[in-house]
Amino acid sequence: MAAADTFRAGAIDQLKQWGERLDVPVVAGKDNEDPSSVLVEACRYAKANDIDILICDTAGRLQTKKNLMAELEKMYRVVGKEIPGAPHNVWLVIDANTGQNGISQAELFNDTAKIDGIILTKMDGTAKGGIVLAIKSELGLPVKYIGFGEKLDDLKEFDVDLYLYSIIEDFQNEH
């Protein structure tokens, strides 16, 4: 894994802890280091150690901040230079409580980094993730995973049938 969120306090340590739990190496930069340089180092580490999968954790960003979107575009570019054809999958993580703002977020991120799918988090909260249907119908982006908490087993592969059933079940229980 690449710890390229070098700006949020504790982000690097948090990813290192996950790496230890999962017995996965973590390439990490220093606080406030250029995230693109961390990704270059991580790509080189992965190639040198015959690692097939490299997950790059980047800082959360608002799509309205042009400098942060330019930084994301740079990260996308440098990974492609280090590993031809990469990145092979780009997933945008969206908080289920975001609501319809998530659509414009996904649209602008997709313009910058060619998103392959969505990971929807905080499904354990009050939001039912109604944004799932809008993202799929308006942008054609599939939801790949949904998160129900912060434990290892709380990230589940998205099952559209189970998701729709849970919405209908909740609706029936209300009436």
Predicted feature residues:
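P-loop/Walker A NTP-binding module and the surrounding RecA-like catalytic core of P-loop NTPases
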Residues: 1-175
